[in-house]
């Protein structure tokens, strides 16, 4: 089964830098099955995020690419999935990102 990976970033993404292969210290990693992501895609479309770099704003997750999720969007995502056990590893990461003002990087399928 296809998986989506998420990691808490150790720094704020910088303009002009692509994060196609983020190699920073991942403080926490979470894996979510594609089926669970697909069920929530319509709701995720309202999340203000960035595609590969903070220079390319987008809405929602880049399903097949890299998404940079800012802290406020992580909080919104947390409220969408906190009741869904399929997001078990990701739920505490989303909450931590919002509370500690950290970014999350998402690696799509």
Stretches with model-predicted labels:
Residues 1-103, 108-109:
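Acidic (Asp/Glu-rich) sequence patches and key acidic residues
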């Amino acid at each position: 089964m296809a998986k989506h990976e998420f990691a808490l970033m150790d720094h704020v993404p910088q303009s002009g830098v692509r994060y196609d292969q983020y190699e920073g210290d991942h403080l926490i990693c979470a894996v979510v099955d594609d089926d669970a992501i697909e069920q929530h895609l319509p709701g995720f479309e309202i999340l203000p995020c960035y595609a590969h770099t903070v220079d390319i704003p987008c809405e929602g997750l880049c399903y097949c690419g890299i998404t940079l999720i800012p802290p406020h969007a992580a909080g919104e995502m947390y409220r969408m999935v906190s009741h869904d056990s399929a997001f078990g590893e990701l739920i505490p990461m989303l909450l931590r990102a919002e509370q500690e003002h950290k970014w999350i990087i998402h690696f799509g399928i």
